[in-house]
Amino acid sequence: MAILELKDVTKKFGGLTAVDGVNLKVEENQICALIGSNGAGKTTVFNMITGAYQVTSGDVIFNGKSICGKKPHQIVEKGIARTFQNIRLFKSATVLENVMTGFHCKTKTGMFNVIFNYRKCMQEEAECREKALEILRFLGLEDVKDLEARNIPYGHQRLLEIGRALATSPKLLLLDEPAAGMNSQEKKELVNTIRKIRDTYHLAVLLVEHDMELVMGISENITVINFGRPIACGTAEEIQNNNDVIEAYLGRSDDE
């Protein structure tokens, strides 16, 4: 069953068409990729899925229901979480505190409970802390839990952003260039981590990534867009042998 489906999705900014008729499907517990050259519209697609942008036409279906028109926080509550190409951590907060912020969108205690039911609020905070520690253990970040986020290595910051996304209990995890800035060893570890996340948390993953070795090695299905338009969809082998993809994207690697 498809957990996410984009049906002929188009996004226009005035007279500019950034995304034009994209169709995409992600099955439950599947790892998929969306690829294309810089400016192809990949992040715009992510922004439409997460409610940062509203679609001009078409539909975004999550868990069998349209989420078009929903606000970003509503989409998080429904079970979609994302990371960003440019890391967006709370740099002066600790590693543990960063993950705990992800749980706060799911907590039930509001201002009334903070004032009149302080014990319940503190109990919920303690539960969030323990769950955050579990995520840090899972990602191998427990040893740096008390450090400020800005003081941990870049690769760890990437993992921390994934950890914060996991704290929202997603059914679909969107990763926007998760390997950007990582060295070859960190990229290998990232591949294993993404697979482990999928298997442990029983979620689907859709990633945008320029590292083709990583994409081809981890993705079960790949969608390719060029100048906002879809040009191919299939397995890694099918994409690698697709003439349109080679001409528009993969074939450029030798020149770059």
Roles of regions detected by a PLM:
Residues 1-256:
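Glycine-rich phosphate-binding loops of nucleotide-dependent enzymes
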